[in-house]
């Protein structure tokens, strides 16, 4: 597991109050991890803070699964 993947999963666990084993790559924040719209906004804010980046709203709407969050950070970490 990459450092970024570990950091993203740690944020998801902290923000959503879920168990580590529930945080699978394909897990949907809403459908699988029980997040609501406020949870997803807070999750995006935590990702922005952790990775010192700004995620535009139109991009944030596409971050709906654990893997999509990891992919977004990987794609934008050097931007």
From Swiss-Prot:
Top-rank lineage group of the source organism: Bacteria
Localization per Swiss-Prot or TrEMBL: Cytoplasm
GO molecular function terms listed in the Swiss-Prot or TrEMBL record: acyl binding; acyl carrier activity
Keywords, ordered alphabetically: Cytoplasm, Fatty acid biosynthesis, Fatty acid metabolism, Lipid biosynthesis, Lipid metabolism, Phosphopantetheine, Phosphoprotein
Record flagged with keyword rRNA-binding: no
Pathway noted in the entry: Lipid metabolism; fatty acid biosynthesis
GO terms classed as biological process: lipid A biosynthetic process
Entries under InterPro entries matching the protein: ACP, ACP-like_sf, PP-bd_ACP, Ppantetheine_attach_site
PROSITE patterns: CARRIER, PHOSPHOPANTETHEINE
Modification O-(pantetheine 4'-phosphoryl)serine, positions: 37
PTM notes: 4'-phosphopantetheine is transferred from CoA to a specific serine of apo-ACP by AcpS. This modification is essential for activity because fatty acids are bound in thioester linkage to the sulfhydryl of the prosthetic group.
GO CC terms, sorted: cytosol; membrane
Carrier domain ranges (all copies): 2-77
PANTHER family (alphabetical): ACYL CARRIER PROTEIN, CARRIER DOMAIN-CONTAINING PROTEIN
Family per record: Belongs to the acyl carrier protein (ACP) family.
Main function: Carrier of the growing fatty acid chain in fatty acid biosynthesis.
Name of this chain's protein: Acyl carrier protein
């Amino acid at each position: 597991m990459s450092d970024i993947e570990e950091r993203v999963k740690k944020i998801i666990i902290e923000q959503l109050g879920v168990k580590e084993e529930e945080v699978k790559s394909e897990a949907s924040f809403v459908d699988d991890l029980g997040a609501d719209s406020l949870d997803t906004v807070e999750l995006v804010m935590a990702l922005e803070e952790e990775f010192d980046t700004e995620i535009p709203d139109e991009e944030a709407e596409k971050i709906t699964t654990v893997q999509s969050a990891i992919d977004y950070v990987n794609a934008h970490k050097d931007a």
